[in-house]
């Protein structure tokens, strides 16, 4: 566990000291903001639902995956783990509004991967592109200093497990 905490701290310090740029600041803020409250993923799901047919089913499964992920992260894991965010732990200045909840796991990343993996399970060709966007979402949260790398990894795993669970249950 100590190795993970040390690794997380080193990555955060490296990003803060070496990777800052105006372009990345703006780009990562835009990426991160698109995931606020899961808006982009919910919009994608409702777009699929509106298309009907198999796409409707994919959208409904995406919504269900997001609900499972959000419940796991926000109602169970974050309140249990209570990990302080890196900007608060290290006194770092951040360029977005200061999040008020805990750091572990990354909810933005969990939602992104729940939606993306759900789509991937329904349609691999479309889903692979959404998985790439989910990875960028995760990076944005570390870049903006509001999550540690392991928060993002855990969010990705929880999101994918949530989608896998929903898809397994729906096929029975």
Write out the residue ranges for each language-model feature:
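Membrane-helix interface segments
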Residues: 23, 54-58, 123-129
